């Protein structure tokens, strides 16, 4: 579970202003944080297949957002993946 404070920090870091939650890098950063949180959950609960479905949905949503960002603004895409450390 990602705290409200952590989400606010991500919005400030990746958004254009403090309330810019719709900006693609902000959405990707929040999804990445939720994915990392779920990874820790699955280390302790290997058989939780119900949550795995939601996890896979989040990963696929992030993948689609990254693809859209890559096609629309490649420089911002590179900055985002570097800041979040999600790809090589």
From Swiss-Prot:
Q: Which GO terms describe its molecular function?
A: rRNA binding; structural constituent of ribosome
**Gene Ontology BP, a term:** translation
**Gene Ontology cellular component list:** cytosolic small ribosomal subunit
Q: What SUPFAM superfamilies would the database entry show?
A: S15/NS1 RNA-binding domain
Task: Check the record and name the InterPro entries matching this protein.
Answer: Ribosomal_uS15, Ribosomal_uS15_bac-type, uS15_NS1_RNA-bd_sf
Q: Which UniProt keywords apply?
A: Ribonucleoprotein, Ribosomal protein, RNA-binding, rRNA-binding
Q: How does it assemble?
A: Part of the 30S ribosomal subunit. Forms a bridge to the 50S subunit in the 70S ribosome, contacting the 23S rRNA.
Protein family according to the UniProt entry: Belongs to the universal ribosomal protein uS15 family.
HAMAP family (UniProt xref):
Ribosomal_uS15_B (MF_01343_B)
Function description: One of the primary rRNA binding proteins, it binds directly to 16S rRNA where it helps nucleate assembly of the platform of the 30S subunit by binding and bridging several RNA helices of the 16S rRNA.
Protein name (record): Small ribosomal subunit protein uS15
Q: Which source organism?
A: Metamycoplasma arthritidis (strain 158L3-1) (Mycoplasma arthritidis)
